[in-house]
Amino acid sequence: MSWDVIKHPHVTEKAMNDMDFQNKLQFAVDDRASKGEVADAVEEQYDVTVEQVNTQNTMDGEKKAVVRLSEDDDAQEVASRIGVF
């Protein structure tokens, strides 16, 4: 791909709750990225299995992806690996 799909992790209080209780991670992604491209990029970059991707275009003009990981992968462990906290 000539552009990066994932820009950076999206860190908010809601994102932390999703990570703790629903095994989800949130990312700011390129506005041209499809759900499939986001899933492939997350699986490739972070070596996890993605179950579902939901996307949202924010009022700020960014595109946000909420990625649910499989039960075999721990969102908190992945977040600590990528430097969220």
UniProtKB/Swiss-Prot annotation:
GO biological process assignments: translation
GO molecular function per UniProt: rRNA binding; structural constituent of ribosome
Keywords (A to Z) from UniProt: Ribonucleoprotein, Ribosomal protein, RNA-binding, rRNA-binding
Coiled-coil ranges (or none): none
Cellular compartments per GO CC: ribonucleoprotein complex; ribosome
Pfam families registered for this protein in UniProt: Ribosomal_L23 (PF00276)
SUPFAM superfamilies associated with the record: Ribosomal proteins S24e, L23 and L15e
Gene3D superfamilies: 3.30.70.330
Record function comment: Binds to a specific region on the 23S rRNA. Located at the polypeptide exit tunnel on the outside of the subunit.
Family: Belongs to the universal ribosomal protein uL23 family.
Subunit structure comment from the entry: Part of the 50S ribosomal subunit. Interacts with protein L29 and weakly with protein L39e.
Protein name: Large ribosomal subunit protein uL23
